[in-house]
């Protein structure tokens, strides 16, 4: 039984986006393994509060990460 865990910032995804993410991850995994596993593939989406992430020894929030992505 495959298990995939995804961690995202708290409140980053809507409930609908989370549902789509779970479906697409399941589809991607079963496309390379076995369609028979679709019914037993677990996807866990864990929301991590902003500030509880760290890179290079520095605690980061969602705004910090967005700035890094934007190249600021």
What is the predicted role of each segment?
Residues 2-72:
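A domain-level signal for the structural core that forms small-molecule/cofactor-binding pockets
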């Amino acid at each position: 039984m495959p298990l995939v865990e995804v961690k995202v910032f708290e409140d980053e995804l809507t409930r609908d986006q989370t549902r789509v993410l779970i479906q697409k991850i399941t589809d991607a995994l079963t496309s390379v393994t076995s369609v028979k596993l679709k019914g037993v593939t677990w996807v866990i989406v864990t929301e991590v509060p902003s500030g509880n992430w760290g890179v290079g020894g520095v605690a980061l929030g969602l705004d910090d990460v967005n700035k890094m992505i934007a190249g600021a």
